[in-house]
Amino acid sequence: LAVADARTLWHTAHVSGAASLEALLGTPVAFDARIQDARGQDGQRDSAALLRALLENSEIRESHRDGDPRVQDAYALRCMPQVHGPVLDALRFAEGLIGRELNAATDNPLVFEDGTMLSGGNFHGQAVAMALDVLAIAMTNLATMSERRIDRTVQQDRNQGLPPFLARGAGLHSGVQMGQVTATR
């Protein structure tokens, strides 16, 4: 279930990342397939493809096509494929390993069709532990990137004119400030 939840979170990070790019008037140029192909990492390619699909009908994206003076966005926006992609690679590793483990014989002793009974160490859970450790590291990186986008979105000096903490009447209302504080803990 943890792996399935991680897959859902990976996809959700792309949806929220695309929404952040839109809210911050970012450009999707960094997700161009040619950039991803130059790196040659499968997860990165797939991440960028998902972001391009999510932004396909974006009116904000269209506003960048002609004469946009900006060269590049903040790392938290333009480096999503470079962070989300390795998370997908780790997720695929964990899915494969855990899938094989779910289909494995882990009893001890093992009894074979010919009646032979052999004691071994297939019960040891190191493979699953390592897969989940890799997944935990990957998900931490995904969360860190998301927190950086949240921070950029709520900080008035960096959020392209959105109200501070996304609240009307900042000072009186905290908006999503506590959500951002929670994300840093």
Model-derived regions, located:
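Proteins with a high burden of low-complexity, intrinsically disordered sequence enriched in S/T/G/P/A and R
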Residues: 1, 26-30, 37, 79, ...
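Glycine-rich beta->alpha junctions and the first turn(s) of the following alpha-helix
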Residues: 1-11, 167-175
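Charged, low-complexity, helix-prone segments enriched in Lys/Glu/Asp/Gln
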Residues: 2, 6, 80-83, 87, ...
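Conserved amphipathic alpha-helical "coupling/scaffold" segments
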Residues: 2, 6-9, 16, 23-26
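Short alpha-helical "patches" and their helix-cap loops
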Residues: 10-15, 32-36, 146-158
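Accessory "access/gating" subregions that flank catalytic or transport cores
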Residues: 21-144, 160
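C-terminal catalytic subdomain
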Residues: 126-185
